[in-house]
């Protein structure tokens, strides 16, 4: 209209309908800049935003980066001030300095203590903390179910793994030296214990999510499985589509990890990428089975439905080198865009809203590989250990009955079950591996 103003008050510009996804928040933030062009150029001119944050990634935090001064006035005196980063309103801070106790009502004229108790009971704790305590640190705990803390991060052997690996969120297991790009308070944890014998993996695959040239990436994830526990060895990403150099480099990784199956999403290119891989496999003389998979479910639902149960059971082990590589990847990309390509950024921000994550190639390749092992995940690592010990005990009894002297010699040499069978000629392997 051409009007100008000395004081502009914008009330509740952020609501659930316009801030659910990253793209919607960026659009809303761009619209907010229009207010600055209407403001009169005076020293005392001001723009004031009033509202409650809807997500951890609220635009009010972005406005603070544009020299706006945020002031937070929760309904109760916070139990912990650290989540507010020193942004409590001066009037409320004065009440606290004068002896106001934690969880006291800050504005009795508006909300009584009983009223707030009823609201918290009806809304749920997380929603109450967001809408009334204005604490965004817990607001997306349920909305974003894929947490880095549910992963097991350690050095992964390329050829073998223990029978079982135990997760624990003890602070002593927190890996603070690794870079994290997840939600606030979300860290990586190392295993508490490795159990059982080390043996070769039951199966190893390479999951490929192909793409064309442009902003998307062609991603390869190398995954192994033993006793229902999955191990992510390495992840590779390329920005040149499905060129020969990209496909050959992926096959080099397959050779490194002794990959048995190449799993390729056929939605892109209608199977042409799989045919190109078969051509290169013939040239490199690699005996790898090529399988295609087609996704029919919406991407966000498919990724969460695949990864959430596996993470909740702590069945995904990630090599430390993957975390370092993810953080250092795409060094030439602008800092604000680099985050969008990082695997663990995509993982922690993935929710069921369409378009929640702008770039999801890496998390999609990982989920595709994990889904391949879905049926095998019903295997219990602890049950496999029990079965192996039972077989070992039965073999000892049989050995003791057959030849007592030989049995004693093998115990002295601390031979395992496979070595004892080879020594007695009861193994299919003609050449003993224990000599």
What residue ranges belong to the model's regions?
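Conserved RecA-like ASCE ATPase "motif II neighborhood" in helicase/translocase motors
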Residues: 1-31
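Alpha-helix termination/capping residues and helix-transition junctions
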Residues: 2, 41-44, 256
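Switch/connector loops and helix/strand junctions flanking conserved nucleotide-binding motifs
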Residues: 16-19, 56-61, 80-82, 270-274, ...
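RNase H-like, metal-dependent nuclease domains and their acidic two-metal-ion catalytic environment used
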Residues: 6, 50, 56-61, 110-293, ...
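ASCE P-loop NTPase helicase motor core
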Residues: 20-97
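Short alpha-helix plus adjacent loop in nuclease-associated cores
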Residues: 81-86, 287-333
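Amphipathic alpha-helical transducer elements in NTP-driven molecular machines
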Residues: 29-32, 300-304, 344, 359-362
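Interdomain motor-coupling "hinge/lid" segment immediately C-terminal to the ATP-binding subdomain
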Residues: 3-6, 12-14, 74, 78-81, ...
């Amino acid at each position: 209209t051409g009007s100008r103003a000395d004081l502009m008050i914008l009330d509740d510009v952020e609501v659930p309908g316009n801030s659910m996804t990253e793209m919607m928040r960026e659009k809303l933030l761009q619209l907010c800049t229009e207010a600055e062009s209407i403001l009169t150029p005076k020293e005392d001119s001001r723009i004031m935003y009033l509202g409650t944050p809807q997500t951890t990634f609220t635009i009010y935090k972005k406005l603070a980066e544009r020299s706006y001064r945020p002031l937070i006035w929760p309904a109760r005196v916070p139990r912990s001030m650290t989540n507010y980063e020193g942004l409590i309103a001066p009037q409320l801070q004065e009440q606290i300095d004068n002896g106001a106790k934690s969880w006291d009502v800050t504005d009795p004229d508006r909300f009584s203590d009983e009223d707030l108790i009823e609201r918290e009971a009806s809304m749920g704790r997380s929603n109450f903390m967001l809408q009334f305590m204005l604490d965004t640190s817990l607001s997306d705990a349920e909305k974003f179910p894929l947490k880095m803390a549910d992963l097991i991060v350690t050095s992964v052997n390329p050829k073998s793994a223990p029978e079982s690996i135990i997760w624990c969120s003890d602070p002593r297991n927190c890996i603070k030296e690794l870079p994290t790009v997840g939600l606030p308070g979300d860290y990586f944890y190392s295993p508490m214990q490795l159990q059982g014998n080390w043996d070769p993996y039951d199966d190893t695959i390479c999951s490929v999510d192909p793409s064309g040239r442009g902003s998307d990436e062609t991603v390869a994830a190398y995954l192994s499985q033993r006793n229902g526990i999955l191990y992510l060895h390495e992840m590779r990403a390329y920005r040149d589509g499905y060129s020969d150099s990209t496909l050959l480099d992926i096959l080099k990784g397959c050779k490194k990890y002794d990959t048995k199956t190449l799993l390729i999403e056929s939605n892109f290119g209608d199977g042409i990428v799989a045919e190109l891989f078969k051509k290169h496999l013939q040239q490199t003389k690699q005996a790898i089975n090529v399988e295609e998979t087609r996704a029919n479910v919406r991407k966000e639902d498919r990724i969460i439905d695949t990864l959430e149960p596996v993470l909740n059971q702590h069945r995904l082990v990630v090599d430390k080198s993957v975390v370092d590589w993810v953080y250092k990847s795409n060094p030439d990309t602008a800092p604000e865009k680099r985050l969008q390509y990082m695997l663990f950024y995509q993982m922690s921000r993935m929710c069921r809203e369409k378009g929640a994550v702008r770039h999801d190639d890496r998390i999609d390749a990982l989920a595709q590989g994990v889904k391949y092992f879905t049926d095998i995940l019903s295997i219990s690592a602890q049950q496999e250990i029990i079965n192996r010990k039972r077989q070992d005990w039965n073999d000892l009894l049989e050995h003791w009955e057959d030849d007592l002297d030989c049995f004693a010699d093998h115990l002295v040499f601390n031979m395992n079950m496979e070595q004892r069978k080879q020594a007695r000629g009861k193994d299919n392997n003609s050449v003993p591996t224990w000599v």
